[in-house]
Amino acid sequence: MAKRIDISGLSAFYGNHKAIEDISMTVEPRSVTAFIGPSGCGKSTFLRTLNRMHEVTPGGRVEGKVLLDDENLYDSNVDPVTVRRTVGMVFQRPNPFPTMSIFDNVAAGLRLNGSYRKSELNDVVEKSLRGANLWNEVKDRLNKPGSGLSGGQQQRLCIARAIAVEPQVLLMDEPCSALDPISTLAIEDLIGELKERFTIVIVTHNMQQAARVSDRTAFFNLAAVGKPGRLIEIDETERIFSNPSVQATEDYISGRFG
């Protein structure tokens, strides 16, 4: 079941360096929220705080709260591994496990969790590949290496792998930046279908993509050179692109900087 995310007063650090500062927002369930802003403003850092991946970076730490349907993901008794099962992630470049078959790529998380019997794996793998709009393209070569697929197919394989463990939230960090236009369109169409089942957050440098796929858009920017990134504005996507409330948002969208 898709879940709502409430973030309050969140700051993230790399050692003594504060990367983002005092971010508060709500991400609605069964919707797509896009993060836009210039390079280095903390979009991807913030995205990684939502499933505690930021802590994997040496010196990475977080202050503030991230509530997933009222459960604080940063409570001391919450296991980060459990968080990452609940909040899945798709990275910028397709990263199928190179030595694994297509089938094993999708089944990897299920086997790691030990949550399915071997007899159930076939059905779950097929369901996940269908959910990623990839089944018809690979059903006759499931035992072939996932690395042999095209770039767009590899990214959809990674999405299938992410949704196989049934997360409630799906984070996407520039999922189309390494893909050609046709593959990008396939991923964008897939995002529109997946939001019926998941809460989706996407980081993108492509403002046209944000306008096409998202329901709400958040604009991030640096407070000043050398200062932490901050959330400048979040609103319905149509409003952000047609009548933003903050001048800096309009300047960025119109290409005056960034």
Swiss-Prot record:
Positions contributing to ATP binding: 37-44
Domain ABC transporter positions: 5-247
Catalyzed chemical reaction(s): phosphate(out) + ATP + H2O = ADP + 2 phosphate(in) + H(+)
Record's signal peptide: none
Single Gene Ontology MF annotation: ATPase-coupled phosphate ion transmembrane transporter activity
Keywords from the UniProt entry: ATP-binding, Cell membrane, Membrane, Nucleotide-binding, Phosphate transport, Translocase, Transport
InterPro entries documented for this protein: AAA+_ATPase, ABC_transporter-like_ATP-bd, ABC_transporter-like_CS, P-loop_NTPase, PstB-like
Superkingdom of the organism of origin: Bacteria
Family annotation (PROSITE patterns): ABC_TRANSPORTER_1, ABC_TRANSPORTER_2, PSTB
Gene Ontology biological process: phosphate ion transmembrane transport
Pfam families the UniProt entry points to: ABC_tran
Record GO cellular component, one term: plasma membrane
E.C. number(s) listed in UniProt: 7.3.2.1
Entries under NCBIfam families matching the protein: 3a0107s01c2
Function statement: Part of the ABC transporter complex PstSACB involved in phosphate import. Responsible for energy coupling to the transport system.
PANTHER family: ABC TRANSPORTER I FAMILY MEMBER 17
Similarity comment: Belongs to the ABC transporter superfamily. Phosphate importer (TC 3.A.1.7) family.
Assembly information from the UniProt record: The complex is composed of two ATP-binding proteins (PstB), two transmembrane proteins (PstC and PstA) and a solute-binding protein (PstS).
Protein name, per record: Phosphate import ATP-binding protein PstB
Gene name of the record: pstB
